[in-house]
Amino acid sequence: MVRTINETFLKACRGERTDYVPAWYMRQAGRSQPEYRKIKEKYSLFEITHNPELCAYVTKLPVDQYNVDAAILYKDIMSPLPAIGVDVEIKSGIGPVIDNPIRSLQDVEKLGEINPEDDVPYILDTIRLLTTEMLDVPLIGFSGAPFTLASYMIEGGPSRNYHNTKAFMYAEPKAWFALMDKLADMVITYLKAQINAGAKAVQIFDSWVGTVNVADYRVFIKPAMERIFAEVRPMGVPMIMHGVGAAHLVNEWHDLPLDVVGLDWRLPIEEARARGVHKAVQGNMDPSFLLAPWSVIEEHVKGILDQGMKEPGYIFNLGHGVFPEVNPDTLKRLTTFIHEYSKGQLAK
């Protein structure tokens, strides 16, 4: 069964003009929703993602509640790592913890390959369920980027400074590039499988790449990213790049064969465009504003929209994920305001 979907988000990704600015929010499915918190009382994140019906429900919930223009599959960037031999546990209040961190070329060589239909069939089944029976907006698939995945695999968990990761990168370049190649292979296969299952766009999250300077990015990270985007591009769906604290890297991303450059709040949209970023742009509200009074939110969002709408190809989003403390009613009101305000401005 082929469902008719609202393609406003996809049009914006392709740099086309739209009647209004499409919006979705990173971590829109999850921590701020009472319904989700009740589910989490009974099930862990990995238990939810292993249950296609439950995972599809969680993924669709913000579409119904907030009227956003895209759904993003509920899962974690660590979800594919067990398939290649990495033991991951999501610990409450900490995040992903890995008991067998990478320390040598031999550790890298032990990593296997992912076969999505065998290793993560529940993720693909969730995508099929959502796209054939449930959603009337596009579904975004996603993956972590090699650098961010490598940082968890080397540090053994979250880090404030990523000293071990960068030390490994500098001191063991042969092992580093072997790891980047292994992870790039995994990301390519994983994203292609999500697209084949029905994802209409994909986003790559490089959450911690902002810790790397431009010169090191070009040498140690960009080659893997170029290969990922080049090999996934023939699949014909929009591809989005997003990182946090990475304003100094947006021109490097713009050079990649992708469609949408994601921005966080540290770099104004108009400044990114002044630097030469003229692909579609996604962003870039500081999620902290969602805890402010509505009058403050409205004025701030107007400013972001006014910048974003100056060129076709703009998607409203946050610069990072929704906080648990955010009132779901605020997100619903925000989506309505984005749609109505942008529609009025674009009609002028």
Curated annotation (Swiss-Prot):
Pathway: Porphyrin-containing compound metabolism; protoporphyrin-IX biosynthesis; coproporphyrinogen-III from 5-aminolevulinate: step 4/4. It comes from the Bacteria. It is an enzyme of class 4 (lyase). Substrate binds at R27, Q28, A29, G30, R31, F46, D76, Y152, S207, H320. The record marks D76 as: Transition state stabilizer. GO terms for molecular function: uroporphyrinogen decarboxylase activity. The keyword GTP-binding does not apply. GO terms for biological process: protoporphyrinogen IX biosynthetic process. The keyword Protease does not apply. Keywords: Cytoplasm, Decarboxylase, Lyase, Porphyrin biosynthesis. Homodimer. Belongs to the uroporphyrinogen decarboxylase family. This is Uroporphyrinogen decarboxylase. It comes from Bacillus cereus (strain G9842).
